[in-house]
Amino acid sequence: MFTIISMAGRGVLFAITEDQTQQLRAARGDDGAVLTIVQDEIEQAWDEAHLCQTDKAWDAIHRCLTDGTLRNGHGPLGWCILGGEQLHQGDSYIVCLLTPEQVQQVAEGLRPISKEWMRTRYFKIDPADYGVPGMLNDEDFEYTWEYFEGVRDYYTKAAAEGRWSIFTVDQ
């Protein structure tokens, strides 16, 4: 479990290779080493074909796909953003890893989600828990939906390629 600070940073999903995954898993327990791999290798390469920027919409996306909070979700929808294996334990950065099997399940879980379903979930988020007064509105929902569509496309492609996935965000 990790601490989420209000007014989250910009999140990015990266569809990574088996070699990159092995490096990250070998570094688990050493937050500095994990960050070096993420920042100096994965982020630095910025492989546009295998990433999805979520800006700050990742927060609302996760809440819509889970119980409305930032707790780790369960099952494929809960894995989409903050689920999976936590590779970084500090409060300054989040790195969550999904296996290719989990990526496939997330892709399948996201496929049928409609804009109406997402809107209903979005407006059930507790404004006090969201931490940004006045942000739960139609304009922010449209922003969230636009990024969600990119996330869904990302998972479809990552699943088709059998890739691992990490979600990263700095706090």
Predicted segments — roles?
Residues 166-167:
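Cysteine-clustered segments with highest specificity for TGF-beta superfamily mature ligands
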Residues 1-146, 150-153, 157:
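Acidic (Asp/Glu-rich) sequence patches and key acidic residues
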